[in-house]
Amino acid sequence: MAQAVADFEALPDDASRAEFVEEPPLIGDAAWDAAIAALAVHLCRLGNFDRTPEWTRAGERYSPRIAWLTLPPESTMQAFVYQRTPIYFKARGVMLDEANLVSV
């Protein structure tokens, strides 16, 4: 995800950024389909878009159960990661430390 953010930020203009967040096909894993939509929302906020793409609000872009993308299911770090998950990921049932969205 951090690489996608870095790639987005390196794009030269708004038209290229808008193309970057066009709807991708569903991959068939509810958690990752939701994560991709949340990432698109994150990128739209970074790019100061007026609105997010309609596809990011489709029902199949929400996970039916909580998904911890960067933690084992029984990790003691869940509370910490939950606190640091951006709201547009939480809203889709995807828990991901905001640090996973930054390249170092």
Regions found by a protein language model. Give the residues of each.
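Charge-dense, extended regions
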Residues: 44-104
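Helix-turn-helix/homeodomain-like alpha-helical modules used for DNA recognition
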Residues: 1-41
